[in-house]
């Protein structure tokens, strides 16, 4: 069961929901952070790997840090924000912003209007949510894309 925590605080384009990310509407595209090597061996990435597979498809896209790899599943896009070279590395805010810009471009070209995601980069990667959310707001400010962030 998801619980909506806010609608639009101070003009924010991010809505926060307490609940399971994978219970989001089936029309929402999803996003999370991974490394170039597509290991997805820990954290929420493991759940993405189990649910959507496609590791070879992701690797074949040969995306680098600051880019985005994409799978299409059941009529929606699954975005893999490439924020670091190896799974054992830590991401930078710069690479996160570049990968978000790449995702935004793909969303706009493909008519994506709703994105759901966890607090990207803030679990095992240890980025600070106040910085990440500010980057998200900045990157998507000139779009009509709605972002829903799920927390457990």
Curated annotation (Swiss-Prot):
Output the SUPFAM superfamilies linked to this UniProt entry: Macro domain-like
Active-site residues annotated for this sequence: 84 (nucleophile), 125 (proton acceptor)
Detail the disulphide connectivity of this chain as listed in its UniProt entry. none
What molecular function terms (GO) are annotated for this protein? Answer: ADP-ribosylglutamate hydrolase activity; O-acetyl-ADP-ribose deacetylase activity; purine nucleoside binding
Q: What class of enzyme is it?
A: hydrolase
- Swiss-Prot/TrEMBL GO biological process terms: DNA damage response; peptidyl-glutamate ADP-deribosylation; protein de-ADP-ribosylation; purine nucleoside metabolic process
Keywords for the protein's UniProt record, in alphabetical order: Acetylation, Chromosome, Hydrolase, Nucleus
Keyword GTP-binding belongs to the record: no
Which Enzyme Commission numbers does its entry carry? Answer: 3.5.1.-, 3.2.2.-
Binding of substrate: at which residues? 21, 119-125, 152
**Residues modified to N-acetylalanine:** 2
Q: Which residues form the Macro domain?
A: 2-152
Q: Which Gene3D superfamilies match?
A: Leucine Aminopeptidase, subunit E, domain 1
Q: Which reaction does it catalyse?
A: 2''-O-acetyl-ADP-D-ribose + H2O = ADP-D-ribose + acetate + H(+); 5-O-(ADP-D-ribosyl)-L-glutamyl-[protein] + H2O = L-glutamyl-[protein] + ADP-D-ribose + H(+); alpha-NAD(+) + H2O = ADP-D-ribose + nicotinamide + H(+)
Tagged with keyword Glycoprotein: no
- Any known activators or inhibitors? Subject to competitive inhibition by the product ADP-ribose.
Q: Name one GO cellular component term.
A: nucleolus
- Please give the function described in this protein's UniProt entry: ADP-ribose glycohydrolase that hydrolyzes ADP-ribose and acts on different substrates, such as proteins ADP-ribosylated on glutamate and O-acetyl-ADP-D-ribose. Specifically acts as a glutamate mono-ADP-ribosylhydrolase by mediating the removal of mono-ADP-ribose attached to glutamate residues on proteins. Does not act on poly-ADP-ribosylated proteins: the poly-ADP-ribose chain of poly-ADP-ribosylated glutamate residues must by hydrolyzed into mono-ADP-ribosylated glutamate by PARG to become a substrate for OARD1.
What protein does this entry describe?
A: ADP-ribose glycohydrolase OARD1
What organism does the UniProt record list as the source?
Mus musculus (Mouse)
Q: What does the record give as the organism's lineage? A: Eukaryota, Metazoa, Chordata, Craniata, Vertebrata
